[in-house]
């Protein structure tokens, strides 16, 4: 029996997709939101005018500000022992962040860290690797003061933020307990991000769209985002198969059921199958443990099974960072896949973002393969400047 296999169009989107549509989804946006929420729940009643002005002057979307201002009014009129805003989702979010060691750490380190989620993940990785080094010294009964300066500084700084001393974690039982505690704190941070996406970001009215995206009409959308932005703007009336590879934000979840993936890349080589104390921080583990969608693997299987069938991959708003190397290579590095990578530019001569994408592709596939796929006789990769966003037609 002859089966007619038709090539597919796959759209791959990253956080740059949401940012390009004016949504406050950067790591800094989320951290600023957490700061504002903390102040909302902790300010003295006599300072209410000052805090209201801070909310009004805050440079963020008006939808978020109006929701927090409403919560502010409820908080101002609350005289119960337990502080609430009559918004149970925001109350839950505050419970997750109020004494969260990771939030505290990032607020303290804010001016030293970039604004992207990659910078956020890199900082977590630095802390994890430093604490893993500390545990190794404790296991071998070695002098922890001989740990390299950079890691030693990270350890001491993070312990200070966690209101701990070296003595508090200076045996195997204590440090294992500490590792478990900061893993739970990361879970709380992830849940607070889920609430932020569901209750605030997804409620923002998006008033612009992009012709590049509109004309693609994909069969599949592979989203590295937690939000439903593409579905809301472009996918309402189309038969599209979605794969939210890092999970899709759902307000019905809680800390235990939240399936969003936010972690670090594997940094070990020879010991990666033996040193498992920090496995819960790693993306591959979270994807398995949280049962995130892996429908994209079926697409890859079809691509490889029928090499004579040509497919089209469109990438928009993804940095092509090496942390997603395994997935990107499976899709891009196929002779029957034509890849179009859209990049942002401020003007016709601006190639800053293009340069970053090229560097990241070298890290993913190596120079030789990148050259053959962009300049060879049978090139499969093309870089395309994004068209200007226009007002959305309602």
Identify the function of each model-found stretch.
Residues 39-42:
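Extreme N-terminus nucleophile/cap motif
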Residues 271-281, 299-303, 329-331:
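A glycine-rich, aromatic-flanked flexible loop/lid motif
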Residues 1-21, 27-30, 37, 48, ...:
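SIR2/sirtuin-family catalytic core signature
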Residues 34, 110, 233-234, 331, ...:
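Generic structural signal for hydrophobic core residues of well-folded globular domains
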Residues 13, 29-32, 243, 247-248:
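Conserved beta-strand -> loop -> alpha-helix junction used to position metal-binding or nucleic-acid-contacting
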Residues 21-22, 231:
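Short N-terminal helix/helix-N-cap motif within the alpha/beta-hydrolase-1
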Residues 288-299, 319-322:
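A general structural motif
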Residues 46-291:
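Extended, H/D-rich, highly charged conserved domains that either
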């Amino acid at each position: 029996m002859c089966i007619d296999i038709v090539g597919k169009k796959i759209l791959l989107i990253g956080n740059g997709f949401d940012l390009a549509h004016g949504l406050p989804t950067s790591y800094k946006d989320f951290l600023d939101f957490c700061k504002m929420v903390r102040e909302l729940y902790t300010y003295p009643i006599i300072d209410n005018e000052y805090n209201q002005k801070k909310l009004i002057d805050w440079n963020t979307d008006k939808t978020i500000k109006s929701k927090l201002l409403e919560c502010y009014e409820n908080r101002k009129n609350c005289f119960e022992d337990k502080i609430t805003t009559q918004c149970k989702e925001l109350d839950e979010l505050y419970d997750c962040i109020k004494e969260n060691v990771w939030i505290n750490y990032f607020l303290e380190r804010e001016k030293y860290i970039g604004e992207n989620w990659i910078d956020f993940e890199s900082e977590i990785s630095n802390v994890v690797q430093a604490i893993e080094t500390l545990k190794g010294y404790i296991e071998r009964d070695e002098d922890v003061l001989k740990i390299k300066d950079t890691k030693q500084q990270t350890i001491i700084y993070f312990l200070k933020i966690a209101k701990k001393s070296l003595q508090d974690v200076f045996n195997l039982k204590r440090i294992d307990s500490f590792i478990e505690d900061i893993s739970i704190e990361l879970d709380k941070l992830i849940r607070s991000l889920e609430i932020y996406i569901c209750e605030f970001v997804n409620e923002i009215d998006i008033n612009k769209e992009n012709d590049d995206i509109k004309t693609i009409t994909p069969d599949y959308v592979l989203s590295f985002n937690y939000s439903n932005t593409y579905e809301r703007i472009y996918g309402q009336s189309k038969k599209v198969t979605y794969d939210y590879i890092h999970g899709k934000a759902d307000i019905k979840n809680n800390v235990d059921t939240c399936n969003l993936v936010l972690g670090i890349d594997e940094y070990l080589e020879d010991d990666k199958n033996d040193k498992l104390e920090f496995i819960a921080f790693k993306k591959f583990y979270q994807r398995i443990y949280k049962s995130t969608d892996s429908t994209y693997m079926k697409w890859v299987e079809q691509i490889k099974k029928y090499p004579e069938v040509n497919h089209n991959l469109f990438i928009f708003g993804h940095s092509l960072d090496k942390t997603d190397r395994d997935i990107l290579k499976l899709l891009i590095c196929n002779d029957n896949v034509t890849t179009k990578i859209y990049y942002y530019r401020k003007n016709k001569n601006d190639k800053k973002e293009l340069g970053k994408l090229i560097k990241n592709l070298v890290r993913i596939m190596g120079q030789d393969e990148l050259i053959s796929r962009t300049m060879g006789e049978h090139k499969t990769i093309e870089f395309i400047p994004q068209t200007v966003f226009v007002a959305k037609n309602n």
